[in-house]
């Protein structure tokens, strides 16, 4: 899809993240496992019932990287844009996933998400003991316009 003239939205920001990840796969082979779980969007009733029966869960974040880094088991990113807000189910899922040892963050834009991914992939293994095995931004945070706030 040609994004040259696309209006910015949560979707286009996420597409930008995925495009960057595709471009950087040789440098970061782990990015081959980054994926989007298409939980969101409007569905007709029959499709919604079918998806629920298949295991769709409300609140699952947009991006998941199931690769342990530092002290974390994996990375979850919920993408937002503009005035987008977290739904109750999203907040609940992110906090629960963080409680199970995942690094979870909400990013308002591709640049913030890419920065988080780069920082996450640069984490050292747990046993180094040098403090470089934790993310600088607190777990379960919201990043917006360079500012960090707790979920």
Listing of model-derived features with the role each one plays in the protein:
Residues 1-151:
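Catalytic phosphate/metal-binding cores of nucleic-acid and nucleotide-processing enzymes, i.e., regions
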């Amino acid at each position: 899809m040609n994004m040259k003239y696309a209006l910015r939205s949560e979707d286009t920001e996420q597409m930008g993240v995925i495009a960057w990840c595709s471009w950087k796969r040789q440098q970061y082979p782990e990015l081959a496992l980054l994926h989007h779980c298409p939980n969101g969007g409007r569905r007709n009733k029959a499709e919604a019932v079918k998806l629920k029966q298949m295991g769709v869960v409300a609140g699952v974040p947009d991006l998941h990287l199931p690769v342990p880094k530092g002290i974390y088991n994996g990375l979850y990113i919920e993408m937002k844009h503009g005035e987008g807000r977290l739904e109750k189910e999203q907040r609940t899922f992110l906090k629960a996933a963080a409680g199970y040892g995942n690094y979870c963050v909400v990013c308002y834009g591709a640049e913030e998400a890419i920065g988080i991914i780069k920082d996450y992939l640069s984490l050292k293994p747990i046993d180094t003991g040098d403090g470089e095995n934790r993310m600088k931004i607190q777990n379960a945070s919201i990043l917006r316009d360079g500012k960090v706030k707790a979920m």
